[in-house]
Amino acid sequence: MRMNGRLPEANYADCANGYRIHYLDEGQGDAVVFLHGSGPGASGYSNFKTNYPSLVEAGYRCIIPDHIGYGFSDKPTDVDHPLSFFVECIKQTLDVAGVKKCTLVGNSLGGAIALGLALEYPALVEKLILMAPGGLSDLPEYQQMPGMQKVFKVFGSGEPVTPEVMKDLFATGLMHDPRYATDELVEERMQIMQIMNGHVMATMQVPVLVDRLHELECPVLGFWGMDEKMMPENGIMAMARNIKHLRLILVTECGHWVMVEHEAMFNRACVDFLLYG
């Protein structure tokens, strides 16, 4: 592993579909795979740098990929990005990494990808940890959320996205506590945004998965911040009413990133769930 600017660069999976997916691979033991969300400059490390070390310390092998179109992974412009494409890229990355069974930890888009993997490859997924996952509401509902409206406004204006604009977007669109929109976070995201293109977000398609949630047989731990500005809160009841084996934690004073704003609680809860279900 080496540092590339502010971000670590480590392993690349040459997937069967011809794309290269970048991923970190730390620790030994049962595999836990962290799936990051969407947004400008997103990467696995930036989303989960304060979480996966605690699980490595607890005795788990942690794999942190960058989704296709994000981080240091390939960024194709000649293919659309439906949920199934993200799912297959992660499945093929895990094949390369030799992972036969794992727990998936997914936030936002990463939560939708985790659900897609668990539904399409149930033998692969032992447990799910979901933080405000996508795939629980339809597009018009997302478009009404204030955080989403802020994203559309910033990136639809045609104006350059400066570090100051990025910081304000995170502080007011994603976080409950703006102190977590740190200069370090902004620098990490700005670095990746310089090498991203708009194709991934322009062609992303995430279907509503609510009607399939009853198919999940694995234990699920869910988190939802009560100051969530990105995901419609009907997702809370969608999970509660349709997932059979669910433990759901509602967190006050928390926005879209429970793993950032409440990292100690989140890390403890994840280790407890991994140990005891």
Identify what each model region corresponds to.
Residues 1-20:
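N-terminal cap/lid segment of alpha/beta-hydrolase-fold proteins
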Residues 106, 110, 114:
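Gly/Ala-rich beta-loop-alpha elbow adjacent to hydrolase catalytic centers
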Residues 16-72:
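Conserved HGGG/HGGXW glycine-rich cap/lid loop of the alpha/beta-hydrolase fold
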Residues 260-272:
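Post-His helix in hydrolase/transferase enzymes
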